[in-house]
Regions:
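Glycine-rich flavin
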Residues: 57-196, 202-216, 221, 226
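FAD-binding core of flavoproteins
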Residues: 146, 151-292, 473, 477-498
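Extended amphipathic alpha-helical segments enriched in small hydrophobics
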Residues: 288-347
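A structural signal for well-ordered alpha-helices, especially hydrophobic packing surfaces
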Residues: 39, 43-46, 308, 330, ...
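Generic structural signal for well-ordered, non-transmembrane alpha-helical segments
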Residues: 33, 37-40, 135-138, 295-298, ...
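Alpha-helix capping/hinge segments and adjacent helical runs
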Residues: 368-498
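Short, charged, amphipathic alpha-helical segments
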Residues: 320-324, 357-371
Length: 499
């Protein structure tokens, strides 16, 4: 396994294909340093002996010790540890750990490539291609961005109906050596600090959309792909540094007649599996959210409690009620993810068929509980922000800049007049309000809230998944029996025992 410095050294050797604010930049540009430090945490923590069980695994391909972020889940224990690893790391960086796209993308492709090879037995080699790619990915402890979201063009038209065929990433041409693709993937988190980019479909596809059923991997500095990155950093401080300063990036990935050799292609035209891959990545990513969002909730809870303490209202009953509400949201989201892990099996939900065996045997979290947990947590994002705003008051929006506090003309007076709790130092109170201003009243803080709401799938997507997969009809039959109506069935929800 590599170190954080190995990771940075690898970034420094990559070709320049990243545009920021109109200019080409290096991956190790200072603007990306906060994001790199977040990603680097996944290497620093994996090297600690106390984190070995949580952060490392044994590769089922090579038998070697690997970083868990490169692992394919082999049992429910792996699913539990992935959730707990994600929560632990997100706590340490105060937000998104950024590396989950890779583990979620690899687990989805691992399963779908196996099934897609059954469409034309002997004619495709998707699964073996992916296993070869994955072996190197694990051995070199690499980071992968997962590029799913297409530009989509006219939202009322399907991919093959678009006036611009590149509104969704598509196979433009097939050759004996590979495929040529064009299109753009957007909102791609941390592609600017990744070694590889995994590309997968974004939606269900029909037969006429088969050219859009494509999955492949390319190096993040690959010829034929350009990145346009947006970098999200908090305001830099000169005098009153944070304990840890996270940063985020997201990229538009432009594929311009990009050639991909067959050995890096994991799906090419099997339209039914394009939709399955889109949904399966979303499922794994929502499972990651059940570790990520509780950790962010832990940070929000601590922030709300400290805001109340700084304001010296921490003993008031309305504060206790709000803290209890935060705790319930945190732990319900985690509990749903825990249950999804515990009920994980090598199976997926297929409409009209229910849960069926899927893939070569790796474990997939239960989709109902993944979606329930993600939806509950996602819908709570703005309520959590409201609670912080309510407890903090207006000071968070109007707090003076740090250099005012070191100006001898006004600094001492500012410390005096911003102190609220006589039992807490004025310096600590000022430092807290600076931190909360970063979280609540900055562009990056706003972006984080939007990401927490939409990341892994907007709540409406979870609601669709829940209502299509949940057995509502059996509940109706049970109630018909209880009510004395025709068509009732007292045993509608009784456990089905296999003989």
């Amino acid at each position: 396994m590599r170190t954080k410095q190995d990771f940075i050294n690898a970034l420094s050797k990559m070709k320049r294909n990243i545009y920021y604010d109109g200019q080409l930049i290096d991956r190790t540009d200072e603007l990306q340093s906060d994001c790199i430090n977040v990603m680097g945490t996944t290497y620093d923590e994996a090297a600690k002996p106390e984190n070995e069980v949580l952060m490392t695994a044994t590769s089922h391909l090579t038998g070697q010790k690997i970083n868990r972020f490169t692992h394919i889940h082999q049992n429910t224990t792996d699913l539990h540890r992935k959730q707990d690893m994600t929560r632990m790391l997100c706590q340490k960086v105060g937000g998104c750990i950024q590396r989950c796209m890779g583990i979620d993308g690899t687990n989805a492709i691992y399963n779908v490539s196996f099934e897609a090879d059954k469409v034309k037995p002997g004619e495709t080699n998707y699964h073996e291609n992916f296993k070869k790619w994955l072996t190197r990915f694990q051995k070199e402890d690499m980071i992968a961005a997962c590029a799913q979201t297409d530009t989509k063009g006219d939202r009322m038209l399907r991919p093959a109906e678009q006036p611009d065929p590149s509104a969704y990433v598509r196979i433009k041409e097939r050759t004996k050596d590979g495929i040529i693709v064009e299109g753009c993937k957007l909102h791609i988190s941390e592609a600017s600090v990744s070694d590889e980019v995994l590309v997968i479909p974004t939606r269900a596809l029909r037969k006429e959309d088969k050219d859009y059923a494509v999955a492949f991997a390319v190096p993040a500095d690959y010829d034929g792909m350009k990145q346009v990155v947006t970098i999200h950093n908090y305001r830099q401080r000169e005098h009153f540094k944070r304990g840890f300063t996270p940063g985020l990036t997201d990229s538009y990935l432009i594929f311009d007649n990009c050639f991909v050799p067959w050995e890096r292609v994991f799906l090419a035209g099997e339209h039914l599996y394009g939709g399955v891959l889109a949904l399966l990545f979303a499922l794994f990513h929502r499972h990651s959210y059940s570790g990520c969002k509780p950790a962010i909730g832990d940070v929000i809870l601590g922030t709300a409690a400290l805001a109340a303490e700084c304001n010296n209202v921490h003993k008031e009953s309305h504060v206790r009620e709000k803290l209890a509400e935060l705790i319930m949201t945190i732990e319900l989201g985690y509990a749903a993810g825990y249950t999804a892990s515990d009920l994980g099996k090598p199976e997926v939900y297929i409409p009209g068929m229910g849960f069926v065996p899927f893939g070569p045997g790796s474990y997939i979290p239960n989709s109902i509980y993944c979606n329930v947990g993600r939806c509950l947590s996602g819908e709570a994002v703005w309520r959590e922000a409201e609670i912080l705003c309510d407890i903090a008051g207006g000071v968070v929006a109007t707090f003076p800049h740090e250099k005012d506090f070191v100006n001898p003309d006004v600094g001492p007076a500012l410390l005096k007049y911003t102190k609220r709790n006589p039992k807490m130092s004025a310096e600590d109170q000022a430092q807290f309000w600076r931190y909360l201003g970063d979280s609540m009243c900055s562009a990056t803080g706003g972006i984080a809230n939007v990401g927490n709401y939409h990341g892994g799938g907007s709540p409406i997507m979870e609601q669709i998944a829940i209502t299509t997969q949940y057995d509502i009809e059996s509940r109706k039959k049970l109630v018909k029996f209880i009510a004395g109506m025709s068509g009732g069935d007292r045993e509608a929800l009784a456990p089905k025992v296999k003989k």
